[in-house]
Amino acid sequence: MSRYLITGGLGFIGAALGKSLAAAGHQVRIIDNLSGGHRDCATPDGELLVGDVADSQLVREAMAGVDGCFHLATSSELATQQDDDIGCNNLPGMINVLSSARDAGTRQPVPVVYASSSITYGDNAHTSLHEDLAARPLTSAAADKAAIEMRASVAALAHGIPTTGLRLFSVYGPAPHPQAHSSGVVASFLDSILAGRGITIFGDGHQTRDFVYLADAVKFFITAMAMPPAQPSIYNVCTGRQTSIRQLADMLCSLCGKAVQITRAPARRGDIRTSVGNPEQAIRHLGLRAGTALADGLAQMLAQHPAGHAFA
């Protein structure tokens, strides 16, 4: 049994990760500022420290005695990246995590697996985005993620901290708690359809995304922690399959057995046209790819939705 720290552990992915770790018999310690999470998302036997990763003393205390750190806390919602905040800055939290990981280990630094994002690729002409492509961030949130990756790389090379970054594509899945909410376009569309409201598509609807089921993303974090790298590593968390936003809307309407009005709005600044990942590096080194088919993941999400029981 191991003890793990999860920053942002009450959020969408963090809460699911904590539950999986606890189910496997591990001890879970969480830092969360409650800005996007709910207390009831914490694991029953876990330890919750309410605070922000920008608090260096809190992070240092939380890192003491842990066998690994999952860093998922963020100061900005990537789901609203178009509302670009020039002042958004996640680097202080990452620096606190890395410095504490360097100092907390008794024999060697604490391994860190952190959440990055496919938005670092920007609006790239490549139809299959691989990890060796240069970052082309279009928003401050994307630039933050790229900077965090560089900080992790330096920490690994200079201080021997095992760091693994996971570039998450479009993660979707059931909300971690009835009073919490999933983020992203899938949750937004599903909520609107079940409530009988219309759907708004920004742009022409032909923009594509690589949708990753939540349970698959969680498995990536756990597997990456079990395989601490000798060199700083980054992996796509993706299926390698693309689905257009209009196709997603049609799939959800069909799944729910409801027809709702679909309207178009102007494309948003910073919105990416095509985003589909190449899973080969993760397959080679982690033995993983996000394998849940979108239709299956949507059905599971609907079955667990508070308003979806009548349609499951």
Question: Language-model segments: which ranges?
Answer:
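Hydrophobic alpha-helix immediately C-terminal to the catalytic Tyr-X-X-X-Lys motif of short-chain
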Residues: 147, 151, 155, 185, ...
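Non-catalytic, hydrophobic alpha-helical segments
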Residues: 69, 217, 221, 237, ...
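Amphipathic terminal alpha-helices
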Residues: 2, 294-312
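Residue-level signal for the nucleotide or nucleotide-sugar donor/cofactor binding architecture
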Residues: 54, 89-92, 139, 143, ...
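Active-site loop of classical SDR/Rossmann-like NAD(P)-dependent oxidoreductases
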Residues: 36-38, 245, 266-281
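PAPS/PAP-binding and catalytic site of the sulfotransferase fold
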Residues: 244-256, 297-301
